[in-house]
Curated annotation (Swiss-Prot):
Pfam families: Acylphosphatase (PF00708). The gene is acyP. The keyword Hydrolase applies. This is Acylphosphatase. It catalyses: an acyl phosphate + H2O = a carboxylate + phosphate + H(+). Keywords: Hydrolase. The active site is at R20, N38. Belongs to the acylphosphatase family.
Length: 93
């Protein structure tokens, strides 16, 4: 099956609250590969690759806030964006 891609930029209180760690667990749950990393402006960027249904479920889970300590202000979603093909989901430091 074809896999879809998306880049998500998540703003709000999303750094220092376990957001990347819990995002990785959500990615495993929905069989999503890609990366998650903190950006210098305080936001988090996610590169995601998965079958369409799983990618949509992953995005919905991110919008709800995977970490109990986070507060999501906005999730910018760029579907179909070019993303490096990966077999795993990794935290980028």
């Amino acid at each position: 099956m074809a896999r879809d891609t998306a880049i998500l930029r998540v703003t709000g209180f999303v750094q220092g609250v376990g957001f990347r760690y819990t995002t990785k667990h959500v990615a495993y749950k929905y069989d999503v590969s890609g990366t998650v990393k903190n950006l210098d402006d305080g936001s988090v960027e996610i590169h995601a690759i998965a079958e369409e249904e799983n990618l949509n479920k992953f995005i919905d889970a991110i919008k709800k806030g995977p970490s109990p300590g986070c507060r999501i202000e906005h999730v910018y979603i760029y579907k179909g964006a070019p993303v490096e093909d990966r077999k795993t989901f990794d935290i980028v430091y």
